[in-house]
Design a protein with these regions (language model features):
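Conserved AMP-binding/adenylate-forming
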Residues: 70-116, 462
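ANL superfamily adenylate-forming
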Residues: 49-53, 129, 135-181, 195-196, ...
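Conserved pre-ATP/AMP-binding loop-to-beta segment of ANL
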Residues: 40-42, 169-188, 195, 219-225
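Conserved AMP-binding/adenylation subdomain of ANL enzymes
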Residues: 207-225, 235-275, 284-301, 305-306, ...
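AMP-binding/adenylate-forming catalytic core of the ANL superfamily
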Residues: 113, 130-132, 357, 409, ...
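Conserved structural elements of the adenylate-forming
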Residues: 61-69, 180, 185, 199-222, ...
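Gly/Ser/Thr-rich phosphate-binding loop
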Residues: 250, 273-277, 289-374, 386
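Conserved ATP/PPi-binding loop(s) of AMP-dependent carboxylate-activating enzymes
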Residues: 380-384, 393-426, 461-463
């Protein structure tokens, strides 16, 4: 085995990855493809207004080398951190892999953050520079000024921006020496309960997620075209839209626009991905669009936008999107309600493969699989990972017993940035405490109960907010729901539901206010389908739910 080699043995499950003494991930994910004859193949396609823009593997390798040289020429050195506030575009690939190849540590963060939070991350990360898309200057520039760390701003523009330095740089760049266990990049957690946390990852972490999940579970290969509505700046999107397609020599489809039913359906129709990665909120909104088209064309009946590419014209000229290129639909970020699974399959003929991952684990470690799906379940353990459920007494729970999910695998972070007290509570003896409550059934399927701090004790019995939310979402009037505990006049905790409707409420239904009528209907709906103690005592109709940039509901804000 050469010092830079990586060998993969797929004769067993999970596949075995064996590294040489040195391994710089950029060489494997970028340079390897040119060496293996894929230089002329399209690595990246851009959707939306940039739909004609493509980048081949040879052009990717050149762009990565130029970006790495430009960063070194601007004074960054191996080990320095480079914060990235960059939209989903080829430059994200160039600077992420260019930094890694040069020995610099890229740190992608959400471009939806405000200056205050960006300033915190600039200071917390100790980054030497921030590379950013020009449309985010309104937050990045004041964040840099407020942080007062001396970090340099590098705007992705020509004529005075960092793209001038890239254009002038040499494309050939030798990979900086690195070992498999060296830190390659950082991410920041989405912060469901407070300030984001810096999460370092090693060179070996990305191959583990790609081989165990992308190949081992999804079966991705060189012919696949991966499109992720979830963006590159967090772990789920980083895998879906970058490391997965580059691992197998496939094609990444990028869309810098905010994902909506209109933009995602347009991208699927025009660029024909084979694998689509979304989140439950977006699947719900897409279904709402499909339902509207179906209602406008009642004579057509059956599925709309099905895997076979059927087209249905509505009375207003609208038609169902052609989803015929898709063979895989994946969901993560929040648990997928079983009714969403059933409705999506009925409407499109496609199953949604629900799974759970985390920033700390880099991607999905429990998942449903093609042809092996249990609606309402998160799935079974991805080969290459271990999972256990631990009760409040610290003892591993048996089948049917609830507790906190802990996982272990080759992609989990070695620790946190500047958070030793959190690290000691979260990573114990190699086990990562996820903070999620789960039940595992006798067949090994894992069933989500909610975040540990979101569980509600009603009448002395723990109940899962997810079960109540899933029941509410079975009602045709409900688009989204979030349930928290609230004290009543007697100081007893009962469920409170915050509900986003599919259509605005009318003022009245007969002589009764519409809100009161629908509240009574939803309460009765829950009482019919849940144990009686679990029904929501209050229902609040809201325009939207508070969420992180990754789509996770921030229930702590609803409890405030």
């Amino acid at each position: 085995m050469s010092p830079t080699a990586l060998t993969i043995d797929r004769s067993s499950s999970p596949a075995r990855l064996a590294y040489g003494e040195a391994f710089n991930a950029a060489s494997w994910y970028v340079d390897r493809h040119v060496a293996e004859g894929r230089g002329g193949k399209v690595a990246i396609e851009q959707a939306g207004e940039q739909a004609s823009k493509t980048v081949t593997y040879a052009e990717l390798a050149e762009g990565v080398g130029q970006a790495g040289h430009a960063l070194l020429g601007l004074g960054l050195a191996p080990g320095d951190r480079l914060l990235m506030v960059v939209k989903d575009c080829p430059e994200f690939f160039f600077f992420f892999w260019g930094a890694i190849k040069a020995g610099i540590v890229p740190v992608p963060v959400s471009y939806l953050m405000r200056a205050r939070d960006l300033g915190f991350i600039i200071a917390d990360s100790g980054c030497r520079a921030v590379v950013y898309s020009p449309e985010f200057a309104g937050e990045v520039v004041p964040a840099l000024a407020g942080a007062r760390t001396g970090a340099r701003g590098l705007v992705l523009e020509a004529e005075g921006g960092v793209l001038d330095d890239v254009a002038a740089a040499r494309p050939a760049l030798d990979a900086a020496p690195a070992r498999p266990d060296d830190i390659a990049f950082w991410l920041y957690s989405s912060g469901t309960t407070g300030r984001p946390k810096g999460v370092p990852h090693r060179h070996r972490d990305m191959p583990a997620t790609c081989e165990h999940y992308a190949v081992g579970v999804l079966g991705l290969g060189e012919d696949d075209r991966c499109y992720s509505a979830a963006k590159l700046f967090f772990a789920y999107g980083l895998g879906n839209a970058m490391t997965f397609p580059l691992w197998v020599g496939g094609t990444a489809i990028l869309d810098e626009r905010r994902p909506t039913p209109a933009t995602t359906f347009e991208t699927i129709e025009t660029l024909r991905p084979t694998a689509y990665f979304g989140v439950p909120t977006l699947y719900a909104a897409q279904l709402q669009t499909l339902d509207q088209v179906r209602d406008q064309a009642p004579a057509a009946g059956g599925r709309v936008g099905a895997g076979g590419g059927e087209r249905v014209a509505g009375s207003s000229g609208e038609r169902a999107p052609d989803l015929g290129s898709l063979r895989l639909c994946v969901s993560a970020g929040e648990a997928l309600p079983p009714d969403l699974f059933r409705r999506w399959k009925a409407a499109t003929g496609l199953q949604i493969l629900d799974g759970i991952g985390s920033t700390e684990a880099l991607h999905i470690f429990i998942s449903n699989a093609p042809g092996d799906v249990k609606p309402g379940s998160t799935g079974r353990v991805v080969p290459g990972y271990e999972a256990r459920i631990v009760g409040e007494d610290g003892v591993e729970a048996g089948p049917g017993e609830a507790g906190q999910l802990e996982i272990r695998g080759d992609s989990t972070t070695p620790g946190y940035r500047n958070r030793p007290e959190l690290e000691g509570r979260t990573i114990v003896d190699g086990w990562l405490r996820t903070g999620d409550q789960y039940v595992r059934d006798a067949e090994g399927w894992f069933h989500y109960q909610g975040r540990a701090d979101d569980m509600i004790k009603v009448g002395g019995i723990w109940c899962s907010p997810f079960d109540i939310e899933a029941r509410l979402m079975e009602h045709p009037a409900v688009l989204e729901a979030a349930v928290v505990g609230r004290e009543n006049d007697h100081g007893l905790v009962k469920p409170e539901a915050h509900v986003v409707l599919t259509e605005p409420l009318r003022e009245t239904v007969g002589a009764e206010p519409a809100a009161d009528a629908l509240t009574a209907e939803l309460v009765a709906h829950c009482q019919e389908g849940l144990p009686r103690y679990m029904y929501p005592r209050w229902i609040r109709f809201v325009a939207e739910l508070p969420k992180t940039a990754t789509g996770k509901i921030q229930r702590f804000r609803l409890r405030a």
